Amino acid sequence: MAWIFLVLLYGLLKGSRALAKKKAMATNSIMEVLLSYTVISFLLVVPQAKDAGGMETKFYFYIALKAFVIFVAWIFSFNSLKRLPVGVFGILDLSRVLFATFLGVCFLGERIGLLQLTGLLLVCAGLLMLKFKLPVFRRIFLLEEPVPVPSAKRLPASADVTTFYVVLALVSCLLNALSGFMDKILMKSVSSSQLQFWYMLFLVSYYVIYVLVKREKISLSVFKNRWIWLLAVMFVVGDKALFIANGMPQSRVTVMTLIKQSSCMVTILGGHFMFKEKDTAYRLFCAFIILAGIILGVL
């Protein structure tokens, strides 16, 4: 049962990171936030360097590959976010759940029982309801109607370009699911300290190379942004918990994926109290459906 609480901790910290990232982005650019909190996170795991040696050579390559997968996933995600309507991302969380479940069942031989399948369907339903509000729920929860954008103010968009960035966004979700799958495989042969130290070292290296090649401007004032420091601490603690959970033989990728969706509870409450977002009652209703799915999934 310990792995369930570790993954739950990861999920709650993941939701908190989303709030901290939004706060951090109010002051600094996307790349400044990504690079600085990755560098700070690496500095926080440097004390683990003494326990990070002794791996077979092939595992350095595998961890470098995992770091590259996440590096590409984040680049794809942020590029697509800049160019697509917000509504397009309604299926993103859902697609991550489906991708991770597919990998766990097909490549790790995990089985989905009736309760797990019911839990998966409830989680998917809750996530979809968060993104696409049906008229009946608009009336029950007194939700605000979306304000239509006049056609004259809409930005012209090429269908081919839009399709390209939709594919980029979905590939990003697939890569994130693949990273979780790789964690489960790697933790059978390496320790959490080894994986976290080398993963962070490779990830920082990729970002430094990217910034140098693209000649991105990074202001040193970014290190005065307290949200970035908080983001780094939550990133390190959350990943450590997730790596340890992956190293436990009884943990299952399919169930872990459901538990990670607990992050939505944090983002909903944080959005209400920190950013004064509306429709909180409806979002909590959706969150409880997701929570019910998570509970069924771990039974």
What are these regions, as identified by a protein language model?
Residues 42-52, 100-116, 171-188, 234-251, ...:
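Hydrophobic alpha-helical transmembrane segments in multi-pass integral membrane proteins
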Residues 2-9, 36, 46-76, 93, ...:
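Loop-to-transmembrane-helix transition segments
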Residues 5, 9, 36-40, 65-68, ...:
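Hydrophobic residues within alpha-helical transmembrane segments
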Residues 12-40, 178-202, 250-255:
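Juxtamembrane helix-loop-helix junctions in multi-pass membrane proteins
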Residues 1-8, 98-174, 281-299:
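Juxtamembrane helix-loop boundary signature in multi-pass membrane transporters
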Residues 41-58, 106, 128-138, 144-155, ...:
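Membrane-interface helix-cap regions at the ends of transmembrane helices
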Residues 26-32, 76-92, 188-195, 240-262:
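Structural motif at transmembrane-helix junctions in multi-pass transporters
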Residues 39-44, 92-106, 202-206, 238-241, ...:
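Alpha-helical transmembrane segments of compact multi-pass small-molecule transporters, enriched
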